[in-house]
């Protein structure tokens, strides 16, 4: 049979155990498919066939699901620079970038032939502009490659591959490693009181967990989820990471570490699980079978984040009480360390307050 015919209903057949009947009860247990991921071309080909066959199977009482898929994600393409030279008939002859020599902005081959840059285009065998994943994984590790691809672009948009930009993802995972690898889990009871700085970090931790949970479950916004985790780690004060940290500071840092490893685990599973085992001393079963729950009460604290801009650019952020008035907020903004450096005692010409 044609592959379109077979693939149009394979989800129902694969859900059932091998038996004499075409479909078993297992199909009704697993269907419909939670998430369909495929290129945009599937929207006018495979999805139409699949929906037709699903309705046919339903009408024949072979399955109960009215629709074959609950959600659809049409992923973008991975792009990379493509290069070519010309044969004797001036036709393009595609070459891999490894063969290209650069000298004073001129591209050539070893034999002296001129090389032309075609720009970013979809990775393909015909244009020889693909990236060998094994080389990248051997150099950076699978987690770094996965993190880079998820962070660089929303999944439904094209991703422009860069051998240099992936270094940023590698450095971030090194930062995570350096923060957690030599620490052990905080095993004491939760403190009864917290300082303002500690409450600010706890607020940030639970706010980030809420954002990331929603990004994964509802929006497929993997890039914004990763950005939120990066922002959380940047928000940890140095004193919380020092050997002299108080019990309450250690507790807040422990919360950051727990949340960070879980939030990264769908994208960087290897380093996340390894660090959790080292950090917690467990076999990892608890890590793989649970997802943390953000504390709504902490998020309902009478606090909000004050965004401080100077000449239209964000220069500072502060978690403050909603009871503070405009004069208090202005004074707080002026005392922000980064803002003070930028102002350098210059007079402020205009203050815009937006509540």
How should these model regions be labeled?
Residues 1-181, 203-238, 255-264:
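Structured secondary-structure scaffolds
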Residues 7-8, 69, 142-145, 258, ...:
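Active-site lining segments that contact anionic ligands and/or coordinate catalytic metals
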Residues 64-67, 272, 283, 346-348:
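Short secondary-structure junction motifs
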Residues 19-20, 191, 306-355:
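NTP/phosphate- and nucleic-acid-binding module
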Residues 72, 78-88, 96-99, 187-211, ...:
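Acidic, turn-prone loop/beta-hairpin segments
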Residues 58, 137, 265, 276-277, ...:
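Residue-level preference for well-ordered alpha-helical positions
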């Amino acid at each position: 049979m044609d592959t379109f015919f077979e693939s149009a209903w394979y989800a129902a057949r694969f859900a059932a155990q091998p038996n004499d009947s075409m479909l078993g009860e297992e199909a009704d247990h697993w269907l419909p498919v939670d998430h369909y991921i495929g290129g945009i071309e599937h929207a006018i080909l495979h999805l139409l066939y699949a929906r037709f066959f699903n309705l046919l199977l339903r009408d024949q009482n072979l399955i109960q699901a009215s629709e074959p898929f609950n959600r659809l994600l049409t992923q973008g393409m991975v792009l990379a620079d493509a290069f070519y030279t010309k044969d004797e008939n001036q036709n393009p002859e595609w070459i891999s970038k490894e063969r290209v020599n650069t000298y004073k902005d001129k591209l050539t081959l070893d034999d002296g032939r001129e090389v032309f840059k075609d720009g970013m285009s979809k990775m393909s065998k015909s244009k020889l502009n693909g990236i060998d994943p094994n080389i990248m994984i051997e150099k950076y590790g699978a987690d770094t490659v996965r993190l880079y691809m998820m962070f660089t672009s929303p999944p439904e948009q094209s991703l422009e591959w860069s051998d240099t930009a992936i270094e940023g993802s590698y450095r971030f995972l090194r930062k995570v490693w350096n923060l957690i690898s030599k620490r052990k889990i905080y095993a004491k009871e939760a403190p009864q009181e917290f300082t303002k700085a500690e409450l600010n970090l706890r607020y940030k931790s639970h706010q980030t967990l809420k954002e990331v949970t929603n990004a994964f479950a509802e929006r497929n916004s993997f890039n914004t989820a990763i950005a939120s985790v990066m922002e959380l780690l940047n928000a940890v004060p140095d004193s919380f990471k020092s050997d002299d940290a108080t019990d309450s500071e250690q507790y807040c840092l422990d919360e950051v570490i727990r949340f960070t490893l879980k939030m990264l685990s769908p994208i960087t599973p290897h380093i996340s699980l390894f660090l959790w085992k080292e950090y917690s001393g467990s076999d990892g079963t608890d890590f793989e079978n649970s997802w943390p729950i953000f504390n709504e009460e902490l998020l309902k604290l009478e606090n909000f984040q004050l965004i401080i801009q100077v000449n239209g650019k964000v220069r500072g952020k502060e978690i403050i009480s909603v009871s503070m008035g405009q004069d208090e907020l202005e004074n707080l903004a002026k005392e922000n360390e980064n803002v003070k450096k930028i102002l350098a005692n210059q007079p402020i010409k205009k203050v815009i307050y937006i509540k």
